[in-house]
Regions:
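C-terminal regulatory/interaction regions
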Residues: 78-152
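Metallo-beta-lactamase
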Residues: 1-71
Length: 152
């Protein structure tokens, strides 16, 4: 049996749960989706991202562990989602002045919504700087002087 899973199951996780960021209790629905996938017992999964895989039980276990981590610490999911959106922008533009990148973030209401709804601690600008630094540390972006570039 073959399952085309889109973002519901990847070999090492799943996609960002955007409804959860917007205030819906969508982590429960994701858990139910993983239960359904498990009950279907697919032999092969074609994910929305990454290679086709056959170790479905292992992938489900990884996804459940990741989901449990997000349930225990929803701010972790928010940080992950924000970095995904930053990376998508870098994939789109490849390179741009850092000031323009930050201006884009500040002008994008979704980032402010995520910050206001899910986080406490640093101010918004500091949070964005931390996210960008994490992208650079992970090799997903490169800062060269006044420019930020896509990497990886």
């Amino acid at each position: 049996r073959i399952l085309i899973s889109a973002d519901a199951l990847w070999e090492r996780g799943f996609g960002v749960v955007f409804p959860e960021l917007e205030g819906d209790d969508a982590f429960d629905e994701l858990g139910e989706t993983l239960d359904l996938i498990e009950s279907l017992a697919p032999a092969t999964v074609i994910p929305g991202h990454g290679a086709v895989f056959t170790e479905v039980d292992k992938a489900i276990a990884i996804a459940r562990e990741r989901l449990n981590g997000f349930l225990a610490n929803p701010a972790k999911h928010t940080r992950h989602a924000a970095k995904v959106l930053l990376k998508f922008k870098l994939l789109e533009v490849q390179s741009l002045p850092y000031a323009a990148f930050i201006a884009w973030v500040q002008a994008t209401p979704y980032f402010r919504m995520m910050f206001d709804r899910h986080l406490s601690g640093p101010d918004f600008g500091q949070w964005i700087d931390e996210l960008v630094a994490e992208l650079v540390r992970s090799g997903a972006a490169i800062r060269e002087g006044l420019v930020i570039r896509n990497a990886g």
